[in-house]
Swiss-Prot record:
Residues 609-619, 669-678 have a biased composition (Basic residues). This is Zinc finger matrin-type protein 1. Signal peptide: none annotated. The keyword Plastid does not apply. The lineage of its organism: Eukaryota, Metazoa, Chordata, Craniata, Vertebrata. Residues 417-434, 620-632, 640-662 have a biased composition (Basic and acidic residues).
Length: 714
């Protein structure tokens, strides 16, 4: 047998070329799909163990020794048989159900099954010996020495190989397949604990040694239980063998992806560095800007002769001291402001209300932790009493009404302007009067509540707070009655043309009244107080932005009187008979006016009468122009009416013939005619109104337009 094994070593897979196992068969014979029956292999014909060849049959659940197959029918060392781990339909170590014979053969010949079986028996501590197989214990060529060590010349544990010749063992150890597997086994041996790697040598080995195809130095679990993996994180690929992992690391795809990964990593680092550099630069700029702002603030404080505050901690420490200092300055300035208020007139004080309001605002903005203002009050009444006492102690009037001051200021300003205007008008009037009877006029003006008020020269009603419109309206009526002028009860807006017309009449009456006043004594002036009061009331309604033209009405009136007299002298002395017949009432009215007026006021009477005559003449001339137009329109209407009557007769005749058909049409035509009549009449009326408006606009002369522009501003 040994000679046959030596001569036919090729059938075991050993190749002289590769100095080891053939890569094709790895120890298997291509003819019998397993071991050669002549060289301790498998018998393809016999089921089970063949007595001739001392091997397993591939049909009867026999397994090749290369992948560590174990039969289920071999006895243990005690002579007792193990339970059937492997049946025709089930594999217990792998947990697989096998239904067909082809499945059983392919499963039992697989490497996964061999590893699972090996791990299964090693975990349970079960070792067995092939029946009928005896190990020779010779010293020269025995597999196991007396000391228990394995002879490397006859058997290798890494590949589970047995050598029949002495020359085959060194050629195998020097070959390429043994060294990488040995390195891998050493790496895995370092990871496993020594208790599981080497058996205990102190205890005697009662069981016989296992066959060479079942021995292993390192306990390695199968892939089903544990599998060593190698991962490439760049390419995200896993490998089960170290050789494939190393070949992948040296490949071109891995190198390209690695270069891309390094490039992206370098870009990220560059971006981070640039971001950090920009942040540092911005922080430096912010520091410089803050320092510049602090320097500007310190310079400004020095220019204002204040202590510069460069640090925020010092500002926080000195905040209370600065607030207290401002409060003291405000308290010291308030009595001085009170003295100025009493000495200066009210108009100047109201024009500059800033310091007092600023001091009050500062007092309100002060913190409440000052010693003078740190009191707590149980009710509002106590706080109000304390406030009144403090104001009286400072020499100020306590403000007990907490309404908004803007409304009261507006009301005071309006009343004060009215008072000043009335005062300016009364003084020149008093200078014109003679001193023969001054008592009557002193009583008249002393009755008015404008003068003699304290301390701001305002009437008592201006100090009230008008809570609603009714109280304000009552006060207004009282003031107007005290001034002997009719109160204005209608507050609707009037047209601009009407206002300008009233103002022109008012100015004319004032100029005539002043001339009449200079000629008459003071006793007769009392009978003509109504025009003066009405002119004064109207002038109060005018805006106060015309001070430059208040001193020129007398000069403008005299120049206007001279121009009108020249025009009057140039006008024709007599009118035509038709015009005199048309307007006899106008001359009668003018004659009555001359009768009632005295001889000293002839100039003003001529002026007013001349204006009225001129306006009436223009109206009559325009009416004379309109008369032929009206007559023509009347003739046209008569003709249209005659034509319409003829049309009506025709329509009546046609309606008698066709009553049923033309009844509706006749009614429609009647309605259309009525609409046409109304439309023609409305158009004529609109034309008349437009002409009248144009004439009223053209009536104003250039002098009146200049007068309006100079006095009224439009």
């Amino acid at each position: 047998m040994h000679q046959q094994a030596a001569t036919s070593s090729r059938c075991q897979g050993w190749s002289p070329r590769y100095q080891g196992w053939s890569p094709r068969f790895q120890g298997w014979s291509p003819r019998f799909h397993g071991w050669n029956p002549r060289f301790r292999g498998w018998n393809p014909h016999c089921r089970g163990w063949s007595p001739c060849f001392q091997g397993w049959s591939p049909r009867c659940q026999t397994f090749p020794p290369k992948i560590n197959r174990i039969s289920s029918n071999y006895p243990t060392c005690d002579g007792q048989e193990q339970p059937a781990y492997f049946t025709d339909n089930f594999c217990k170590p792998c947990g697989v159900v096998l239904q067909h014979e082809s499945e059983r053969i392919s499963h039992f010949e697989s490497e996964i099954h061999a590893q699972n079986v090996k791990f299964f028996f090693q975990m349970h501590g079960e070792q067995s010996e092939v029946p009928g197989r005896k190990v020779n214990m010779h010293a020269g060529n025995s597999q196991v020495c007396s000391s228990g060590e394995v002879n490397r010349n006859n058997f290798t544990d890494l590949h589970n190989m047995s050598f029949d010749s002495l020359a085959a063992a060194p050629s195998h150890y020097v070959g390429k397949s043994h060294s990488p597997t040995q390195n891998q086994s050493l790496e895995e041996h370092d990871q496993v604990s020594p208790s599981t790697c080497s058996p205990k040598m102190d205890e005697p080995n009662t069981t016989p040694a296992p066959p060479p195809f079942l021995k292993s130095v390192i306990v390695k679990p199968p892939p089903a239980y544990r599998m060593r993996t190698y991962v490439c994180h760049i390419c995200s690929i896993t490998f089960t063998s170290l050789h494939m992992f190393r070949s992948h690391m040296q490949g071109t795809e891995h190198q390209i992806k690695r270069a891309q990964h390094l490039w992206t990593h370098w870009q990220c680092t560059q971006l981070l560095e640039s971001h950090v550099i920009n942040q540092v630069k911005n922080s430096k700029k912010m520091q410089e800007s803050c320092q510049a702002e602090c320097g500007d603030d310190i310079k400004m404080k020095k220019s204002r002769e204040l202590e510069p505050k460069g640090h925020f901690r010092e500002m926080e420490d000195n905040y209370m001291e600065a607030q207290a200092h401002e409060y003291r300055e405000m308290v010291d300035s308030r009595p001085r402001h009170k003295m100025l208020e009493q000495t200066l007139p009210l108009e100047n004080f109201w024009a500059h209300p800033g310091p007092y309001n600023d001091s009050r605002a500062l007092e309100e903005q002060l913190p409440h932790n000052l010693p003078a203002e740190s009191k707590t009050y149980d009710s509002f009444q106590d706080e109000l009493e304390d406030y009144i006492k403090g104001q009286k102690a400072r020499g100020l009037d306590p403000n007990t009404s907490f309404r908004r001051m803007s409304e009261s200021y507006r009301y005071r300003d309006q009343r004060y302007r009215e008072r000043v205007d009335s005062e300016h008008r009364q003084r020149p009037c008093e200078e014109r009067f003679s001193f023969e009877a001054p008592q009557t006029y002193q009583q008249e003006y002393s009755a008015s509540p404008v003068e003699g008020q304290s301390p701001h020269w305002l009437p008592s009603h201006s100090k009230r707070r008008n809570d609603d419109f009714q109280n304000e309206f009552d006060d207004y009526n009282k003031v107007q009655e005290s001034r002997e002028s009719e109160p204005k009860t209608s507050f609707r807006r009037m047209d601009s043309s009407f206002e300008t017309h009233n103002y022109e009449e008012m100015v004319d009456r004032r100029s005539s009244h002043t001339m009449f006043e200079e000629g008459l004594p003071c006793e007769t002036f009392q009978t003509y107080t109504d025009p003066y009061s009405s002119a004064q009331a109207v002038e109060n309604t005018l805006p106060h932005c015309l001070p430059a033209y208040e001193n020129q009405p007398s000069l403008d009136a005299e120049s206007h009187y001279q121009l009108t007299t020249e025009e009057f002298s140039e006008m024709p002395a007599s009118l035509s008979l038709s015009q005199q017949e048309d307007n006899p009432s106008s001359y009668n009215v003018d004659y009555d006016i001359y009768k009632h007026l005295p001889s000293n006021d002839n100039a003003s009477a001529h002026e007013t009468s001349h204006r009225r005559r001129r306006q009436k003449r223009k109206r009559h001339l325009e009416e004379g122009k309109e008369r032929p137009e009206k007559e023509q329109s009347k003739h046209k209407r008569k003709r249209s009416y005659q034509d319409k009557d003829l049309d009506k007769d025709k329509l009546i005749k046609q309606s008698k013939r066709e009553e049923d058909k033309a009844g509706v049409s006749s009614e429609k035509t009647k309605h259309r005619r009525k609409k046409r009549k109304h439309e023609t009449s409305s158009e004529k009326e609109e034309r008349k109104h437009k002409k009248e408006k144009k004439k009223s606009v053209e009536e104003r002369t250039e002098e009146e337009i200049l007068w309006d522009e100079s006095i009224l501003g439009f």
